[in-house]
């Protein structure tokens, strides 16, 4: 702790305060505009311990517990963004208040009301689960003034990290690289977490092994960045065997018509394998961007799996549908 404190002091790095005076707010707004880095801020937004992605969607993908952030930067001033992060209960968007539903048997449910009819209400809890409750079983229903977003989430950030996070949020929805585009990227993926069990066939079948259903696999949601790219350094190494490392992602595409359809794959082609419903798609060597042809013999929902091999690296990969008869299914 003393070493960390010394490093922070030497670099002028301070932990983030949980409330700001008027003068501190003005200073923070100025810092966001002058020093904030949206690219760094997006990486901070995606940190698993902050739970931003788990609770908020940006466009099509992400959690549904909190408001969609797709245009927050274009619609909200900086002081609103800052205060909503530091004191979330002061800035609760309509429809996202915490509802407390107490049942006649003593059970209670807290969350957001998704829908309500004469006979039933549906409440979404903090995990995103929908709970259906018969109106006849309800003893009371109250709205809490407390936000679903926990207080203190940003306490784990340094001031400079907070500045970058706010800068990223302030760019969402504005013209530029942080406006969700109409490009047809695969944005909702699942990944195999680190330390996934090895069925023991990787040395025989290579990357294609991962296309087989295996009860030991526990897939986890994983979302692309606003621009559609997948940051390779965030994808866990599912399996390590001697010098080989495997990072495994899967997504789904809807095929409207049988036939050959094109997708665009970006990334180091020498370390990527792509499979359609378990069948390998040939990828030319030594490319960073290539258009591939999928021979779709069936319509409907089909699985695409991307396996990265070799030492874990930085950079991004992405997959984009080019044919009109392909639609990336960006909900898990």
Where do the protein language model's features map onto the residues?
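Extracellular and analogous surface-interaction loops
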Residues: 241-245, 249-262, 293-299
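The canonical Cys-X-X-Cys-His
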Residues: 48-59, 69, 165-169
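C-terminal capping alpha-helices of c-type cytochrome domains
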Residues: 3-13, 27, 107-109, 113-119, ...
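Beta-strand-rich ligand-recognition modules
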Residues: 274-318
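Gly/Gly-Pro-rich "capping" loops immediately C-terminal to redox-active cysteine motifs
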Residues: 62-86, 98-143
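Accessory carbohydrate-binding/adhesion or oligomerization-edge regions at the termini
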Residues: 3-34, 166, 170-237, 242, ...
């Amino acid at each position: 702790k003393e070493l960390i404190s010394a490093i922070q002091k030497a670099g002028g790095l301070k932990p983030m305060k949980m409330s700001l005076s008027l003068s501190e707010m003005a200073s923070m707004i100025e810092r966001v505009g002058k020093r904030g880095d949206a690219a760094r801020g997006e990486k901070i937004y995606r940190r698993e311990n902050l739970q931003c992605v788990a609770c908020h969607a940006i466009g099509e993908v992400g959690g549904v517990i909190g408001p969609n952030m797709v245009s927050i930067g274009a619609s909200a001033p900086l002081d609103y963004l800052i205060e909503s992060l530091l004191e979330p209960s002061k800035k609760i968007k309509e429809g996202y208040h915490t509802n407390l539903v107490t049942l006649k048997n003593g059970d209670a449910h807290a969350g957001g009301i998704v829908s309500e009819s004469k006979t039933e209400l549906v409440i979404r809890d903090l995990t995103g689960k929908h709970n259906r409750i018969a109106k006849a079983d309800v003893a009371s229903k109250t709205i809490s003034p407390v936000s679903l977003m926990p207080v203190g989430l940003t306490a784990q950030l340094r001031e400079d990290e907070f500045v970058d996070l706010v800068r990223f949020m302030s760019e969402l929805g504005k013209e530029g690289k942080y406006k969700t585009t109409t490009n047809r990227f695969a944005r909702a993926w699942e990944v195999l977490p680190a330390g996934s069990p090895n069925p023991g066939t990787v040395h025989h079948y290579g990357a294609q092994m991962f296309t087989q259903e295996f009860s030991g696999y526990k897939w986890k949601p994983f979302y692309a960045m606003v621009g559609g790219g997948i940051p390779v350094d965030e994808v866990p190494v599912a399996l390590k065997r001697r010098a080989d490392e495997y990072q495994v992602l899967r997504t789904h595409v809807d095929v409207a018509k049988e036939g050959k359809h094109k997708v665009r794959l970006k990334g180091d082609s020498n370390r990527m394998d792509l499979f359609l419903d378990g069948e390998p798609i040939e990828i030319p060597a030594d490319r960073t961007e290539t258009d591939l042809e999928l021979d779709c013999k069936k319509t409907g929902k089909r699985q695409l799996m991307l396996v990265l091999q070799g030492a874990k690296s930085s950079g991004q990969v992405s997959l984009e549908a080019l044919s009109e008869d392909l639609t990336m299914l960006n909900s898990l």
